[in-house]
């Protein structure tokens, strides 16, 4: 995994967790006043871009048969589904606990909130069934149910399948690039047509369904092919064997210059991305450019060098990246328990609640990563390897197992 991309994923997961607490759950105060945090839901689109790039880099040359595609989907299923099931269960238990407390207090004449205890369809078995079938985010329902960030996990799973089918059906590289570009173009067209007749509040990327994921995921695929093309270009004379005797100072100066250009481009793209996220509510249809700028940021980080890349290499951000999926899916459980406190406590004490929230999210994420995410991912690799090779003796932890 490219370390700068890993760190970027961690930052995005943290921002989404803060958004759901301070903005979505209306804790208010700082940092909810920051425009970037108010629109941090957009960083889900960054996740999709990263996923598209990673899938293309890891699998575009390996998905050459139905058996390979089946093994790939097994890996992706075991990567996503076990943690989804566990965190959906923890959210259900948290809601059950909170509602039970409300019910007990209601019998004592103490009313909390406007809703009656258990006065909503959170435990509707039909909704839970859609959740467990990973259909909650594809557009069948519009409700935010259970572990509501998991809508994007639902979309991502079906994007994985779309990607595998595309790689199987279209073999020439140019045709794959054209197909991916067509999917991106169709997704843009979908939003433009939808927004042309939608009420003003609905003219936003903050929607659910496959088109939003397709728009960003297949940009990630295009990034991979573009970077691969760049890497395959003939090297300049400075990098050719004929220039082997060139002065070391000149070579170092050229490398320093290239690094300076890359760093400047990374900073500019990052600042532009944050500016557009901050101004999303004012952009109208121009907000469609935001996923494209995210794609540019990812492209500039792929070399894993430059000033922004070095920042993302730092230990705290690498830790966030390693635990980003767990952070993304566990934070709603913690938020369910602390929600009333975050809204009730004024500043500056609210910041203590925020620190407690993050501490609990990080702690829970460490547990779920160690006991759910990582071991089940390894089991998926073992099963996929058996399917692909017919080797029934594959074992967990075998370093030869593909990722």
What are these model-derived regions, one by one?
Residues 314-316, 375-403:
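Membrane-proximal cytoplasmic C-terminal regulatory module of class A 7TM GPCRs
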Residues 213, 217, 260-374:
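Alpha-helical transmembrane segments of multi-pass integral membrane proteins
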Residues 44-60, 152-169, 180-239, 245, ...:
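Specific transmembrane alpha-helix
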């Amino acid at each position: 995994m490219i370390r700068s991309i890993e760190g970027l994923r961690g930052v995005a997961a943290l921002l989404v967790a803060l958004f759901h607490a301070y903005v979505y759950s209306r804790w208010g105060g700082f940092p909810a006043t920051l425009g970037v945090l108010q629109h941090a839901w957009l960083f889900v689109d960054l996740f999709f871009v990263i996923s598209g790039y990673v899938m293309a880099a890891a699998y575009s040359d390996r998905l050459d048969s139905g058996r390979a595609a089946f093994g790939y989907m097994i890996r992706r299923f075991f990567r996503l589904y076990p943690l989804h099931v566990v965190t959906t269960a923890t959210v259900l238990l948290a809601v059950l606990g909170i509602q039970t407390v409300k019910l007990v207090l209601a019998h004592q004449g103490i009313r909390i909130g406007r809703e009656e205890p258990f006065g909503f369809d959170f435990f509707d078995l039909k909704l839970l069934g859609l959740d467990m079938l990973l259909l909650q985010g594809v557009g069948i329902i519009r409700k935010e149910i259970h572990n509501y960030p998991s809508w994007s996990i639902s979309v991502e799973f079906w994007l994985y399948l779309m990607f595998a089918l595309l790689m199987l059906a279209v073999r020439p590289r140019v045709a794959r690039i054209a197909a991916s570009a067509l999917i991106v173009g169709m997704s843009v067209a979908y939003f433009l047509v939808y927004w042309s007749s939608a009420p003003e509040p609905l003219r936003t990327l903050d929607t659910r369904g496959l088109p939003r994921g397709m728009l960003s995921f297949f940009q990630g695929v295009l990034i991979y092919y573009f970077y691969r093309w760049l890497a395959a270009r003939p090297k300049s004379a400075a990098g050719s064997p004929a220039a082997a005797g060139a002065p070391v100072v000149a070579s170092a100066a050229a490398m320093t210059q290239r690094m300076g250009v890359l760093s400047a481009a990374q900073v500019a793209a990052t600042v532009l991305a944050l500016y557009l996220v901050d101004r999303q509510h004012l952009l109208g249809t121009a907000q469609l450019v935001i996923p494209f700028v995210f794609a540019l940021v990812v492209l500039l980080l792929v070399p894993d060098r430059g000033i922004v890349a070095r920042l993302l290499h730092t230990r705290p951000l690498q830790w966030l990246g390693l635990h980003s999926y767990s952070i993304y899916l566990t934070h709603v459980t913690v938020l369910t328990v602390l929600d009333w406190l975050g809204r009730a406590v004024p500043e500056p004490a609210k910041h203590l609640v925020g620190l407690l929230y993050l501490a609990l999210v990080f702690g829970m994420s460490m547990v779920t990563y160690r006991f759910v995410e990582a071991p089940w991912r390894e089991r998926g690799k073992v099963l996929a390897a058996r399917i692909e090779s017919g080797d029934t003796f594959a074992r967990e932890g075998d370093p030869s197992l593909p990722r």
